[in-house]
Amino acid sequence: MSSTTTVAEFAAELNKPTATLIEQLTSAGVAKVQASDHLSEVDKQKLLGYLQASHGTVTAERKKITLVKKSTTEIKQADATGKARTIQVEVRKKRTFVKREDGSDLPAEEVQPEVVAAPQVPVIDDAELIRREEEASRHAELLRRQEAELAEKRRLREELDAKEAARELERQAAAESAKAAAEAAEAAKKAKPVTGKAKEVAQPAGAEASRAAAETAVAEEAAATKAADAAVVQAAAKAKATAEFQADAAKAQDLQERRRKAEAEAAGIRAMMSAPKRVLVPHVDPKAAIKGTLHKPAVAPGAAKPAAAAGAPGAPGAAGKKEVKSENLSSTWKDDAAKKKGIPSRGATAVPGRGNFRSGPRGRRSNDRDARPESTFVAPTEFKVIEVHVPETITVAELAHKMSVKSSEVIKHLMKLGQMVTINQPLDQDTAMIVVEEMGHKAITAALDDPEAFTDDDVQGQQAEALPRAPVVTVMGHVDHGKTSLLDYIRRAKVAAGEAGGITQHIGAYHVETPRGMISFLDTPGHEAFTAMRARGAQATDIVILVVAADDGVMPQTKEAIKHAKAAGVPIVVAINKIDKADANMDRVKGELVTEEVIPEEFGGESPFVGVSARTGEGVDTLLEQVLLQAEVLELRAPVEALAKGLVIEAQLDKGRGPVATVLIQSGTLKTGDVVLAGSTYGRVRAMLDENGKPIKTAGPSIPVEIQGLTEVPQAGDEFMVMTDERRAREIATYRAGKFRNTKLAKQQASKLENMFSDISAGEVKMLPIIIKADVQGSQEALAQSLLKLSTDEVKVQLVYSGVGGISESDVNLAIASKAVLIGFNTRADAQARKQAENNGIDIRYYNIIYDAVDELKAAMSGMLTPDKKEEVIGTAEIRQVFKVSKIGSIAGCMVTAGIVRRTARLRLLRDNVVIFTGELDSLKRFKDDVKEVKESFECGLNIKNYNDIQEGDILEFFEIKEVARTL
């Protein structure tokens, strides 16, 4: 379009009639009357402005532009605990440019930089705080308005009182004038004439006075009536004003109280917003009273000390006060003197009233009234029952302090109960409560004063969305039923061949990606010794796969696995393994499981039964489908973007890596560098490995990982959680360790009391002390339980120490001191430990299969048993002739009728088949030669030791006592 256009062209361009456009141009102030007139750009702008103004679409030109610039820095500042923290500081700069008329853009104003500190995490959300502050401000405004109204009422009431006081003064003045007039009239009435002349002269005056007096009396009576009415009205008004004043005062007090509460609430909200993070504070028992004595009353903490009752004479402010007697002053000196420790000297201690050998000069006795106590009589106090809060463990001294008695009294009562204790010995809760009840007080179980109450704060602050998670499946069953082989087929790996003896002795944790989703598997041992390990597996699981061999059926550990699964309340999927064998019988297995209350779905139960073969892989896909179907029914969810929580499945001490724990994450995400609290140990996660040994940085729910960096080896089965503060984690771990130690010591002491009488016969019992070192926590626990079960009434297994890790020099030293056998399960001794063990004759035994350890220890214990004595008859002889020899006695000539006769054997003398003597031989001869034995059908001569009453025809029965080794 050209710079100039005709009206007709512009109308055609706008699709408007030319007449309409000319009319609009005329209205806009552009003088165009013909279609051929030319239009410039200025004319078009005028037309546009007119049309926009007429239609209300005028856009005001922007006159001002504001620019905001932000910059963020960090500063370090100490918080309430004294720890340096990094605070984010945000600086906002605002600058505004205004377009002037002359066309220049100049900055109109520059706002000062606004420093905004990193916001504190509020306890209450911002909307709630704003609402509360607005409500508090409205409340305060209402109170101010009501106070203004009250002040106005008070001002009006004061003006009314002032007017009433003025009227009262006027009434009093009128009453006084009326009274004065009445007194004058009375005086005039009483006046009498002195003389008759005076009387005559005074008569007209008297009549006039009487008239005046009558008028005055009438006026006075009217004034009195009026005053009485006014007094009644005034009293009523005053009573009404008083009532209104009291009501207003009560209302003002109520308003003031409400205003104070509103201001306190607003101040509390502001303090809450600016309050520092909560820290641990030592617990103070609210029931602990501040105790004092009669002469020295207790002073509350923080209270000022009471001022002196009276000052010294001449002291400021002493004037006008009662004088203090000298004897009262000297009493304080006596107290100070009594507090001072006496100087030790030779001789007896001076007794008050009896003099001392170090008496005054010239043998005079000194006055010892000052040394005499005020009174030796102590008033008996009434017994007071105290509520004693007894924690889990408490020392004897602490218990005595809580009951306000001496420690010796508590020790006496414990001695009466048959327990010898010292003042610093810890008592368990049950024993302490018995002692408290025995001493007549009331024992209450104390609430735990532990820092663990703050562990939930971090978790509650993390409100993350719960997302679906993978199921955790535990494979359980009897030993050698094919649990690990089934998992091998699922994982396409060969793990069973790597286990010692082909049996599983650790919990294996794996996660498997299947086409239908991820599943985490826990493989538990089936051997009977690993009961606790199986229970931990059931505790951490969502679904249990119960593996039963089709050719073996339900066995003891199968029943135990069913009990664990039912106790944990998890669904059971039964996998009947080894169906490819010729002697497999699935119907028999189903019948046995029905007996154990595991009902298959085809019989109307809840447990799906799947036949599988770990060798060929038959039925494995169906088994996984059933597992995932059960997981869908359970709707398993867990928060992902939160602090990790889970369970310690296994723990061990690695020589190169230190304490290593296998954990199963149940919720949240575990990251490298997180501070972890697990039971009584803590640490920062230095490294994380998956089940294949590959390092990973993060792990989410249902993922088993191996973590390093803990300070000690945790207990298998402990819960672990991620803490935000390492200092708090250390505090809780230290507290738990001390609590565990105190509880353990107290239980040991309680067991000593129970075993007091059984220890009398303990000398007859032989002890086999052992020290166990295993590779992982679960194996150590299982081996210790299995070996302790071998104890009998004659030989007991004494577990000196059990731990995780290799055999060190300190273990050998402990074995030397306790004369114990060192057992290494999947561990070995280092060079120094081996050398020290050889030098001191310490027996170190290594095992990698739990059967071998149990069998060898059982054999060693069998060797310690006292052998049984068994009598064995070796031969008989008949006395054919008796010879009497002087100085020797009777010699029997015998014929050996059966067996053999030995010189060292014992014999019985039978006469008419009745034993009349049991003894031994003095000599045995054949012809003239001494012999050791004589065989059957040979003759011999023998002399019985210390016995001569023998006859022909007697039978001699020879026997030996043999020791037979016993077995457990």
UniProtKB/Swiss-Prot annotation:
Residues 523-526 are annotated as: G3. Residues 477-484 are annotated as: G1. Residues 613-615 are annotated as: G5. GO terms for molecular function: GTP binding; GTPase activity; translation initiation factor activity. Residues 305-376 are annotated as: Disordered. It is found in: Cytoplasm. GTP binds at residues 477-484, 523-527, 577-580. Residues 577-580 are annotated as: G4. Residues 305-319 have a biased composition (Low complexity). Transmembrane segments: none annotated. Residues 502-506 are annotated as: G2. Pfam families: EF-G_D2 (PF22042), GTP_EFTU (PF00009), IF-2 (PF11987), IF2_assoc (PF08364), IF2_N (PF04760). GO terms for cellular component: cytosol. Residues 468-635 form the tr-type G domain. HAMAP family: IF_2_B. One of the essential components for the initiation of protein synthesis. Protects formylmethionyl-tRNA from spontaneous hydrolysis and promotes its binding to the 30S ribosomal subunits. Also involved in the hydrolysis of GTP during the formation of the 70S ribosomal complex. Belongs to the TRAFAC class translation factor GTPase superfamily. Classic translation factor GTPase family. IF-2 subfamily. This is Translation initiation factor IF-2. It comes from Polaromonas sp. (strain JS666 / ATCC BAA-500). The lineage of its organism: Bacteria, Pseudomonadati, Pseudomonadota, Betaproteobacteria, Burkholderiales.
